[in-house]
From Swiss-Prot:
Annotated Pfam families: UPF0370
A single Gene Ontology CC term: plasma membrane
Organism field: Pectobacterium atrosepticum (strain SCRI 1043 / ATCC BAA-672) (Erwinia carotovora subsp. atroseptica)
Keywords annotated in UniProt: Cell membrane, Membrane, Transmembrane, Transmembrane helix
Protein name in the entry: UPF0370 protein ECA1289
Segments passing through the bilayer: 3-23
Family stated for the protein in its record: Belongs to the UPF0370 family.
Region annotation Disordered: where it falls in the sequence: 39-63
């Protein structure tokens, strides 16, 4: 771990460079074009649909 104490500044420069490159790439993302050409989601599959029509076992609420 002595090398970490000697070369901590190199690791810091690499991390700052990665952060700056990430910010640059995020600025290049065109969110409006993505929203206009957004892929359709498949329909939601309801796994409980066969039980929805049956009566519930819960007691009825009294008015």
């Amino acid at each position: 771990m002595a090398w970490l104490a000697d070369y901590w500044w190199i690791i810091l420069i690499i991390l700052i460079g990665m952060l700056i490159n990430g910010i640059k790439e995020l600025r290049n993302v065109d969110h409006t074009r993505f929203l206009l050409n957004k892929p359709k989601l498949p329909p939601h599959r309801d796994n409980n649909d066969k039980w929805d029509n049956e009566e519930d076992d819960w007691p009825k609420k009294k008015p």
